[in-house]
């Protein structure tokens, strides 16, 4: 059997294969209320029908002020749970496990009114200047991640991913470019890591399932985080109980990264080897043979597919064919899926 189509365990959750749908914002909430719509149901469940092992929902805000836009999903109140439960049930029907990415946009929120950040430094010259979070407000953010995790459990999710990448709030704390604080949340790396550690520990108080963290392994900027900074972060995450690190890059400052097939895989490889923690690789992985090579050479443990799954919900089926595998079709499609 190919490695791509072997089972993989995240704590007590067994994935049927190692293909993961990357969380990707769809900006498709209709009433600015954070509630998932029929679009979200069709969008995510179709990828489960196509054979994806783990489907991770897009950035889901833990606070209303923490949305990237007014059209983002949310889990800051109980009214948002039922639509997500329906969606989770749909994913489970097709044999996929359900994940959700909990997030806070921080200074990258594009919303009316006040936005917040670790320091009063805007994302760029066109962005609003954020208000520096007080210690009390930081504790409330941590508490809201915990509340959102409890709601995720109520909705039936199998996996929680904490979004600490792409320039959003937790990443803003991690990077010295955006964190100029002089208290115990700023300065040395251990202080800058504190909010993420606090969030992981708070989530674990109400959630006994696997936790993934998405990071940006480089800021692509002078004075920012580089790969070597993420080795201690990853070791601390492992000690805090994180099962796997989803390794992306960039997003903290407004620069275009160099992009080519598999361009982020070396970062996943180095963090995996340097910190002794499982990683997920992503970034222009578009073919089954490419995914198989990454796994067979132990460069990562899971393959996280983004835009290729937007183009092709049946990526898993086609990857199986190229690797000489046969995967079970949804019974409704079996007459055509040979």
Curated annotation (Swiss-Prot):
GO annotation, biological process: response to toxic substance
EC number: 1.6.99.1
CDD domains listed in its UniProt record: OYE_YqiM_FMN
GO CC, alphabetical: peptidoglycan-based cell wall
Gene3D superfamilies xref list: Aldolase class I
Reaction equations catalysed: A + NADPH + H(+) = AH2 + NADP(+)
Keyword annotations from UniProtKB, A to Z: Detoxification, Flavoprotein, FMN, NADP, Oxidoreductase
Recorded GO MF terms: FMN binding; NADP binding; NADPH dehydrogenase activity
Cofactor: FMN
Ligand binding (substrate): 27, 163-166
Residues where FMN binds: 22-25, 59, 101, 214, 306-307
Subunit (UniProt): Homotetramer.
Functional note: Catalyzes the reduction of the double bond of an array of alpha,beta-unsaturated aldehydes and ketones. It also reduces the nitro group of nitroester and nitroaromatic compounds. It could have a role in detoxification processes.
Membership in a protein family: Belongs to the NADH:flavin oxidoreductase/NADH oxidase family. NamA subfamily.
Protein name: NADPH dehydrogenase
Species: Listeria innocua serovar 6a (strain ATCC BAA-680 / CLIP 11262)
Gene: namA
